[in-house]
Structure formats: structure tokens, C-alpha cells
A protein has these predicted regions:
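Hydrophobic alpha-helical scaffolding
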Residues: 25-31, 53, 75, 121
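Long, contiguous amphipathic alpha-helices that act as assembly "spine/axial" helices in icosahedral shell
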Residues: 1-18, 43-54, 58, 87, ...
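Sequence/fold signature of self-assembling virion shell proteins
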Residues: 67-153
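Active-site pocket-lining segment
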Residues: 56-70
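Domain-core detector
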Residues: 32-35, 52, 59-61
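Alpha-helical scaffold segments that mediate packing/assembly in large oligomeric complexes
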Residues: 1-42, 149-153
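Short, conserved, surface-exposed binding loops centered on an aromatic residue
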Residues: 40-47, 77-80
Length: 153
């Protein structure tokens, strides 16, 4: 999900061209309307999978404490869902990152298959064998417009 700002060849949802955005400057002040925008942006993109949110655990906890409106007793995130979409947790994205979309549009390509090699020499003194597995893969986004990311400004 995360690209590498130092190497433009390594992109993720956060740096990919064409990914749509919703501006939420301060998550603690987010509104229900802010989160309805995520689905509105991908709704016309002919998605085939089930859209989901991905965010940090702290962000999900914050949204569990923000009321949808005054008086209903309902919250933006209830039962780890926002507007019927699952909220998944990823500890490797940025603290402020929120992604939404059809993750079946993230493709993984592999070359040459899985290569497994046995090294009988490295641990020979202890009677063990080292198993080495290599897989060459790359990731691509089929349709960036099926994703939305939160931006702060």
C-alpha cells in the first residue's frame, strides 16, 4: 500500500496516479458526510469486488467514538464497519493513512514460479539443512479510480 517517495518506480496506493482523494484535515473532527464521500467516489467505477477500508487501529478507534449525527447514538465506525464496508487494520501504513476501495484491483504478477533450494552445507555440523525460497513478484493497480485515499489538505 505504501510507495517509496525516494524511488518513483516503487508506487503504492499512496503515490499512484489516478487514486481519488477525500480531504479530512483532522480525523478527530471527521463527519459522517466525509466517509460517505469515499463510497460516492468509487460508486460509479464498475467495481466487481467488495470495497473495504484499510487504516491504522488508532484511526478505527477514533472513528468508533465520533457520532454520526446528534441524537441517534450511532457512530461512524460500528462493529468494525463504516457504511456497510469492513474496516481492516494494517500497522504498516502511515498513522494518518486511510484507504478505501476494491482491493481485487490490486494485481500480483510472478515470474518463474517459486524456487526452492536446499543448502546442505551451512548447518552441516548440526545435522540440519537450510531451505531457501525465492519468488520474484510485482504489484500493479488495474484501475486506480476504484480507490480513494484520505489526504489532510
Amino acid at each position: 500500500l505504501k510507495g517509496n517517495a525516494a524511488d518513483p518506480a516503487i508506487t503504492g496506493l499512496d503515490t499512484a496516479t489516478g487514486v481519488q482523494t477525500v480531504t479530512i484535515a483532522n480525523l478527530a473532527n471527521a463527519t459522517w458526510q466525509d466517509f460517505l464521500k469515499f463510497d460516492a467516489l468509487v460508486g460509479d467505477m464498475a467495481i466487481t469486488g467488495t470495497p473495504k477500508f484499510i487504516m491504522r487501529s488508532a484511526s478505527r478507534q477514533t472513528l468508533k467514538g465520533i457520532s454520526k449525527d446528534s441524537g441517534s447514538g450511532r457512530y461512524i465506525c460500528e462493529g468494525n464497519m463504516i457504511d456497510g464496508a469492513a474496516v481492516e487494520i494494517d500497522g504498516q501504513i502511515g498513522a494518518d493513512d486511510i484507504f478505501y476501495g476494491d482491493f481485487s484491483n490490486i494485481l500480483v504478477g510472478t515470474w518463474g514460479g517459486l524456487e526452492v533450494m536446499l543448502d546442505p552445507y551451512r548447518w552441516a555440523r548440526s545435522g540440519q539443512v537450510e531451505i531457501i525460497a525465492n519468488l520474484i513478484a510485482d504489484v500493479a493497480i488495474r484501475n486506480p479510480k476504484t480507490f480513494v485515499k484520505r489526504v489532510k489538505s
